[in-house]
Amino acid sequence: MSSVLQLLLEGECLETHQMAEILGMDETEVESELARLRDEKVLLGWRPVFNPAEVEDDLVRAVIEVKISPEREGGFDRLALRISRFDEVESSYLMSGGYDLLVIVAGKNLRSVATFVSERLATIDGVLSTSTHFLLRAYKEQRHLLVEEAAASDKPAVSP
């Protein structure tokens, strides 16, 4: 793995001259490596990690288990890509187990997510079934704990 990529994955927001200093590289080498990582679609971008409860007032997120029928040519890929192109879809993954795709969606409210699932996702040819799970609370996001340690350990003592 590229040392520049490893430094990015550690989560610090650094300028190229800071990265060069940490890695013992020339700044132009770091810039060149970042350009290569972008060109090769290894580095797709980066975004700040935030606490959804503090930023997204009414945003509703859901995890959807989707069973799909693989196609003779291309298996799951064509249908998975079609589903992934919807604006509501934040992430999608091919899974092993009881369902084929794990789709994470976001909407402005519960109704918009429900409408997306019932009218747009479930009606696609090849989608056999969906199971939607609404996210109620986030405890960890992108390796960052979102809940204060004191609150997490405030549980009643268990008496024998």
Regions inferred by a protein language model and the residue ranges of each:
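A compositional/biophysical signature of low hydrophobicity enriched in polar/charged and small residues
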Residues: 1-160
